[in-house]
């Protein structure tokens, strides 16, 4: 009897986590369309950064949300407040805003846009990557 009750609870949690993942996926897709980022690329980045989870936080930095946006990056993109306490939609908005800036700066080069999002905008202006941006 106890084992069945535990299974039902565990099953309920699994179903809930899938529902949250579907919501996060929908939020990421919506923001990608708004910001002009290819949806497949945006989902790939969210999967790499957080497994497409809204509540994901990096314990060693201020990164949080589906695109793991840093507090300083969110501020640079115009957010005021603590990004770690913001809603999933807000975190996705500012993370996607940064990813879109990287994507445009890389002129559609997804590998370079990925590096820019993960490392920083200075990647776009290094001598090594100037040729990639021209192409």
Language-model features, listed with the residues they occupy:
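Positively charged n-region of N-terminal signal peptides that target proteins for export
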Residues: 1-5
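Cleavable N-terminal signal peptides
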Residues: 7-9, 19
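Generic marker of residues within folded, mature protein domains
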Residues: 9-11, 59
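N-terminal signal peptide c-region/cleavage motif recognized by signal peptidases
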Residues: 14-18
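Catalytic glycan-binding domains that act on GlcNAc-containing polysaccharides
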Residues: 20-135
């Amino acid at each position: 009897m106890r084992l069945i009750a535990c299974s039902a609870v565990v099953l309920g949690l699994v179903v809930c986590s899938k529902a949250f993942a579907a919501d996060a996926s929908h939020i990421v897709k919506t923001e990608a369309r708004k910001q002009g980022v290819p949806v497949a690329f945006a989902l790939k980045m969210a999967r790499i950064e957080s497994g497409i989870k809204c509540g994901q936080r990096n314990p060693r930095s201020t990164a949080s949300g589906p695109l793991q946006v840093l507090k300083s990056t969110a501020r640079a993109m115009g957010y005021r407040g603590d990004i770690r306490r913001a809603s999933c939609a807000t975190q996705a908005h500012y993370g996607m805003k940064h990813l879109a800036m990287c994507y445009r700066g890389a002129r559609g080069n997804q590998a370079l846009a990925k590096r820019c999002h993960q490392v920083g905008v200075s990647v776009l202006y290094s001598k090594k990557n100037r040729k990639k941006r021209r192409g």
